[in-house]
Amino acid sequence: MRTSQYLLSTLKETPADAEVISHQLMLRAGMIRKLASGLYTWLPTGVRVLKKVENIVREEMNNAGAIEVLMPVVQPSELWQESGRWEQYGPELLRIADRGDRPFVLGPTHEEVITDLIRNELNSYKQLPLNFYQIQTKFRDEVRPRFGVMRSREFLMKDAYSFHTSQESLQETYDAMYAAYSKIFSRMGLDFRAVQADTGSIGGSASHEFQVLAQSGEDDVIFSDSSDYAANIEFAEAVAPKEPRAAATQEMTLVDTPNAKTIAELVEQFNLPIEKTVKTLLVKAVEDSASPLVALLVRGDHELNEVKAEKLPQVASPLTFATEEEIRALVNAGPGSLGPVNMPVPVIIDRTVAVMSDFAAGANIDGKHYFGINWDRDVATPEVADIRNVVAGDPSPDGKGTLLIKRGIEVGHIFQLGTKYSEAMKAAVQGEDGRNQILTMGCYGIGVTRVVAAAIEQNFDDRGIVWPDAIAPFQVAILPMNMHKSYRVQELAEKLYAELSAQGIEVLMDDRKERPGVMFADMELIGIPHTIVLGDRNLDNDDIEYKYRRNGEKQLIKTGDIVEYLVKAIKG
């Protein structure tokens, strides 16, 4: 490709509304342009990267035995009503109507469509297992699209759905998808972790997220420093402390704390160690409970894990915190004065709180706290559960090492769905015993457009993008200095362009009448891994300057050796 026949569209300045580095560099490198909130046009450079990501995904899915299909973006509402998600999905589901006023949705996902297809196409257990995938546009009407294509409303996704007659068969495909995803992200040159995850609203029995490690990530990725254990923050278990509860050394005392409405204020004003404080949170109880609320207690320096809390049998789903009015109606005190002593609703405490002694907590009286509280002496030990987020330095749940926490960008997710959709939509085949058998499902997603942004978040410097070789838009940039004035430079540039292209190498030759500084800046911004610079001065010595984008190292290579050198560097 020649720049004179290409839409380069680079920008010198960073657009003001681009918050994260991937969004900034995708705009500056001429990869995308914003059409409307959360909607982007992909320009030629961006499409080249996108297609490389797609091709790697497609190759590994095919290698894993999956079969490619293509389903409509527009889906009839009847399928969503049948699955029960028409009411459940919320405002992210874009609902539309055709000219006959028939309701449809712009698909955010395709579980309903694939399940409808399979129930009409399959009739026997002998046809299973099968795993279907597509690479298709999705639309989710995000309330606040941000970070460019990282959280856009329209995006490209690889979604796969497998069908089985047994849990064992599902597990085999799940393991194959886990391995395929690991190959996909490894081939792309990404530093990632596969982490255990909560199944969330999709449901099912097992789930793993594939997280690309990056400072701009929205997720906390938890992993051991001494083993393969990895999980997301919602799933990671906070191991119970090994140390027994220390004996009481203080009497419980009611203390005036009129200006301490938060743990931070209490600690600062009374010079308390934060590890000796407890915070109390009131949440809605399940319907028909004797009490409308449940009290959840965590140590002052810990955070409640809302996913874990929501799974408690006493707690309503979705997790809903009590309002100040509801709290005052219960204990006649504000949220900053709550504690376990004389709490009139069921109390559940975190494992760490269970081993505390001589601790401080609200007295359920405005402006007052109890200091020196001890379990069993001042208040009975309540039910104990793991309800907090882990923190760095906690012991790993597998007993090997301690936990580290890094930020991650979720680029893939695999689920064992079970029979959630097949039961709702009556997707069944004739089993080996001749009776109808509801199908067991798995689903497996990769955010193709998000992978592009995540790769940039992990691969950039102050000059631009530093693409992993496998997904770079071009492999080699040829920069002929003053080629319009030097026949020798022009002739060699054309010769190398033809020879490299004949080797199947993707080349961008900058044949613009531009200053060398502009040419260098654009190629570094775009992130092409290998650059060769042709200039009369070096050619006097039969030399070509070669530069590797990732480490910035330069070297002179003889003109007769440069093609062989590049072929070896790129193809190995």
Swiss-Prot record:
Keyword terms, alphabetized: Aminoacyl-tRNA synthetase, ATP-binding, Cytoplasm, Ligase, Nucleotide-binding, Protein biosynthesis
Subcellular compartments: Cytoplasm
PROSITE patterns noted in UniProt: AA_TRNA_LIGASE_II
Enzyme class, spelled out: ligase
EC number(s) from the headed UniProt entry: 6.1.1.15
InterPro entries linked: aa-tRNA-synt_IIb (IPR002314), aa-tRNA-synth_II (IPR006195), aa-tRNA-synth_II/BPL/LPL (IPR045864), Anticodon-bd (IPR004154), Anticodon-bd_dom_sf (IPR036621), Pro-tRNA-ligase_IIa (IPR002316), Pro-tRNA-synth_IIa_bac-type (IPR004500), Pro-tRNA-Synthase_IIa_type1 (IPR023717)
Keyword 4Fe-4S on entry: no
Gene Ontology process terms (BP): prolyl-tRNA aminoacylation
GO MF assignments: aminoacyl-tRNA deacylase activity; ATP binding; proline-tRNA ligase activity
Domain notes for this protein: Consists of three domains: the N-terminal catalytic domain, the editing domain and the C-terminal anticodon-binding domain.
Family, per entry: Belongs to the class-II aminoacyl-tRNA synthetase family. ProS type 1 subfamily.
Family annotation (PANTHER family): MITOCHONDRIAL RIBOSOME PROTEIN L39/PROLYL-TRNA LIGASE FAMILY MEMBER, PROLINE--TRNA LIGASE
NCBIfam families hit by this protein: PRK09194.1 (NF006625), proS_fam_II (TIGR00409)
Name by which UniProt lists this protein: Proline--tRNA ligase
Gene it is expressed from: proS
